Amino acid sequence: MATPEEKAKALEAALGQIEKQFGKGAIMKLGETQKLDIEAISTGSLSLDVALGIGGLPMGRIVEIFGPESSGKTTLTLSVIAQAQKAGKTCAFIDAEHALDPIYAAKLGVDVKELLISQPDNGEQALEICDALVRSGAVDVVIVDSVAALTPKAEIEGEMGDTHVGLQARLMSQALRKLTGQIKNSNCLVVFINQIRMKIGVVFGNPETTTGGNALKFYASVRLDIRRVGSIKNGDEVIGNETRVKVVKNKVAPPFRQVDFQILYGEGISRNGELIELGVKHKLVNKSGAWFSYEGEKIGQGKTNAMKWLAEHPEQAAILEQKLRSELLANPEKALLADLEAESESNISEVESDF
């Protein structure tokens, strides 16, 4: 029977052989690094970046964004592209739905001249293009819009009444098996947009499910459930949506965080609105009655006027955002406690209003 010293030597020799054959980092002890240094790309929403725990969507991983129609899925991914391009990264958009509006994308801050776009004929072609872009190592962000539109070639070439049971699910499973290793090696962020469907005959539990089988649920490091929960009105005119995003899966930070933010038509995510709300919540912006003040200076009566002040003073807005980002990402527990306090206060006010 081998002694502990002999076992340690044998293990060291085996690890050395594995690293020699497969390269440095092929195998390591989990406790060697206290914290995984994961590069992230901002989503364009400060509150969502904080909820994700690392400041955005993780590079070198697969992300799924799903939700009902007109919930803001494409808007959120275009916002990710805009933030990535600002950081000097190369982005590609695989438009399987053939529905990308370049004018709207430009309004959200996307440099459409530099954006790579493909409108494939079928699901196999879309996933092959995605694989080629990832393998090149030259593309940093790939968006696939959407999984539901990745129609297998056999289905397109077949008759209307033909049944193709599980064909799309098998296609996704095979593609993800190929992609997942290459995505890590190339440090590319791949985002799949997905739609939801209703499962027939479900009596107990949630009847909603996403398209394309279960493979994407397993391979995705982050899954975001995005919903429209209300409308933003200016008088009688609807000018945007109240949007709620729940982090239903997160392999790089604690999951199940939930955030609300505004998406304004023609503008995208309301950055200044988030700065005001988060600033008040974390006591960087003072609110007294209807008045908001920042660093001792009154910036507006009502949230709309405070947002206008930030829009007119971009330097101050950038400083406030940097303060919030550094404070909340360095202390995620503080952000979580502030969310819980705000939620409990809203619940108390609702109970009081009932009486």
Curated annotation (Swiss-Prot):
Which GO terms of the molecular function aspect are on file?
A: ATP binding; ATP hydrolysis activity; ATP-dependent DNA damage sensor activity; damaged DNA binding; single-stranded DNA binding
Q: Which residues bind ATP?
A: 67-74
Provide the coiled-coil residue spans: none
The processes (GO biological process) annotated in the record are: DNA recombination; DNA repair; SOS response
Alphabetized Pfam families for the sequence: RecA (PF00154), RecA_C (PF21096)
Q: Which CDD domains match?
A: RecA (cd00983)
Q: Name one GO cellular component term.
A: cytosol
- Name the InterPro entries on file: AAA+_ATPase, DNA_recomb/repair_RecA, DNA_recomb/repair_RecA_CS, P-loop_NTPase, RecA-like_C, RecA-like_N, RecA_ATP-bd, RecA_C_sf
Q: Which SUPFAM superfamilies match?
A: P-loop containing nucleoside triphosphate hydrolases, RecA protein, C-terminal domain
The source's superkingdom equals Bacteria
Q: Which UniProt keywords apply?
A: ATP-binding, Cytoplasm, DNA damage, DNA recombination, DNA repair, DNA-binding, Nucleotide-binding, SOS response
**Subcellular location(s) of the protein:** Cytoplasm
Keyword presence, ATP-binding: yes
Q: Describe its function.
A: Can catalyze the hydrolysis of ATP in the presence of single-stranded DNA, the ATP-dependent uptake of single-stranded DNA by duplex DNA, and the ATP-dependent hybridization of homologous single-stranded DNAs. It interacts with LexA causing its activation and leading to its autocatalytic cleavage.
Q: Which family does it belong to?
A: Belongs to the RecA family.
In terms of NCBIfam families, this protein maps to: tigrfam_recA (TIGR02012)
Would you tell me the protein name for this molecule?
Protein RecA
Q: Which organism is it from?
A: Histophilus somni (strain 2336)
Organism lineage string: Bacteria, Pseudomonadati, Pseudomonadota, Gammaproteobacteria, Pasteurellales
